[in-house]
Amino acid sequence: MLILNNGQLKQFYQKSQKDKIIAVDTEFHRINTYFPKLCLIQISNLSESIIIDPIDFPIDFKLIEEIIYDEKIKKIFHSASQDIEILFNLFGKVPKNMHDTQICLMPLGYDNSTSYAKACVDFLKIEISKENQFIDWRVRPL
């Protein structure tokens, strides 16, 4: 679901507080810029997934901060370093109670750069399309 207003984001946060777990991914642009420019945030709880478009639909970033930094909610990332970098640049802090599935794969014999697509194939037998992996996330409409 594309989040169009703060009310929708508040409802999602309330559901996430009950679930106590979310998955987070960001899309950004970092060509010819020192700091990455946030273009999209994707968050899923146990019942729904949302897309936050900070370019076309300005949302109260305080609400995003509340979700991402709620220590009672476990955050799941894959290859979190760049997500953490952009979140730190926005909010000046690193999320707590977070897990990086890429790091979790390392004790199982995977290297430190195992892709999300590889993990999905190996563990879930699901092939993930990577056709949009290198698109310019600044371009609208999505």
Regions found by a protein language model. Give the residues of each.
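A short, charged helix-loop
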Residues: 118-142
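Conserved RNase H-like, two-metal-ion catalytic cores of nucleic-acid enzymes
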Residues: 1-118
